[in-house]
Amino acid sequence: MTGKLTGFKAINTNTVTNKFCQKMNKTDSICGSCYSMAMLQGSRKNCQPAWQNNSEVLSQAPLTARQLPVINERFFRFHGHGELINRTHFENLCRIAEHNPATTFALWTKRRNLIRGDKPSNLILIYSNPTVDRVLSKPPKGFDKVFNNVAAPRTNENCTGQKCADCLECYRFEGSSVIIERVKIRH
């Protein structure tokens, strides 16, 4: 990954073909200025074929034991680019986490309807609040953290542009369960 995610590895999916992302990108939510949608249609266009393959493999059927990757990272991100496509997709990410118990995984999603039941103990679920300037003070049921975006500076911002690898607030179970970042608008 690059930018604030430098140093992290991730499994990404294709936002351009994700029906949820297509719909949300036409709203005034944070998705209306989605960095991934813009990058995959511009500077990261070359990533679309590989990430489309990930979208298909993760969402169409349960992964077999042979398909489960070995992740040799302390922290790993699901979806530096992408969003859950369906329940099968979520279950496959859980399978990957279960297969790699020494790694802490973090998954951001706006798809609360797909999160239910047990999850692996090494998976941090972060609700990605789609509404700018409506800070949720606690995570929804089933989530470990909530990630909020604000348009103007606030004294309680705790995601302030540093490198994620230097902070790790989102990648540790302890610490704040409420993350607040100022919006980075991309057009």
Report residues per predicted region.
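Class I S-adenosyl-L-methionine
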Residues: 1-187
